[in-house]
Amino acid sequence: MSEVDVPELLFERVWLQVDRDRDGFIYAKQMPSFITQCEQVIKDTVNTNKTDFHMTRFKNRLKLPLLPKLHMDLIDAFAKETPYYKIYKESFSDMLNKLTGNNFSTVINKIFEDCDGFPASFISALEVKADVKSSPRSKADSLGSPIKVDLLRNLKPQEEPETPRRINRKYKSLELQLESMKRELEDKEKTIMNNERNLTELRSTISKLKEKYDLLSEEYEQRHIHGGNNGTAIKHDVVIGELKSRLQEQNRLIRILQEQIQFDPQLKRETRVHDNKSKNNTFNGAIAYVIPFLLFIFVIRSLITKEDIGDATMALPWWERNNLASRLAWYFRDVFSNDSAKFLESDAYDKVFGIH
């Protein structure tokens, strides 16, 4: 490449076009235009001599545009957010480096990296135009006609910082936006709280269902392990123990009554002679105690065990498979049946209950 600093020549030329009043700085909103004008100057320069073979080959090897779309979007966003930020001539390259990761010289040199040097006509075009632009006499020419210069100067006051009224209006607009965002935040917080509450309820329900499932699974395993269709093998040991103790108590009372009848033959004969009222008075206490107990057994039994449907018609009732319960059931069935008087007179009745 040539020893001439092409990026510097290009920068000086475009800076004179953008900094029309020679303030030594440009605003951030002018930065996108600066990049665009740099690209346009390069295109115009290479097209000055279309018959030059070296210039044509140089043009075909250029890598335009200067910046990719992503970097231009970053510069546009910076210009819109801080339109009146002052970028001084000495700090322009650093600002470009902060936004795109490359300074001005690097950006310009990248588009020429495939070229075998700069054609002499290209360098001379940049130098001549730069000299013309730098002369005070040609300031109006660089901007176009004097009318254009006057129009741009007349528009200059509109580019000054915003008035207090506009600032106040923007402040109120920002306040409204802030209130709207606060309301949205509150709504989202309420939604989150409702979701958390629903989640807690669902977790509680799932926990209860899991406990029930575990209990049923364990009971099912116990039933199959300890007896198949025999419903006595159930987890509820406390209930079963209570039933056993009550059955033992009832068995004891029955033995006491049998001993009293066997001990006093006269009582046995009087029992046969007297009417049913005398017999009922003898066993009234036992009957009043046993009947609620039997009802309690049937209710508990129906709650804690159920027979399989398929075996219901083939298996005997549970109370018939238990000797003590079977004897009690048949005894009270005989006592309260219509033919109870006949059973009282029969020898079979005496034989069953051990009365001789």
UniProtKB/Swiss-Prot annotation:
UniProt keyword list = Coiled coil, Cytoplasm, Cytoskeleton, Membrane, Nucleus, Transmembrane, Transmembrane helix
Record-level GO cellular component terms? cytoplasm; nuclear membrane; spindle pole body
* Pfam family name, one: MPS2
Q: Which domain of life is it from?
A: Eukaryota
In what way does this protein cross or attach to the membrane? Single-pass membrane protein
Per UniProt, subcellular location reads as: Nucleus membrane; Cytoplasm, Cytoskeleton, Microtubule organizing center, Spindle pole body
- Membrane-crossing residue ranges in chain numbering: 285-305
Cited InterPro entries: Mps2 (IPR031433)
Coiled coil located at which positions?
A: 165-264
What family classification does the UniProt entry report for this protein?
A: Belongs to the MPS2 family.
Its annotated function is as follows: Component of the spindle pole body (SPB) required for insertion of the nascent SPB into the nuclear envelope and for the proper execution of spindle pole body (SPB) duplication.
Name used for this protein in its record:
Monopolar spindle protein 2
Q: What is the lineage of its organism?
A: Eukaryota, Fungi, Dikarya, Ascomycota, Saccharomycotina
Q: Which gene encodes it?
A: MPS2
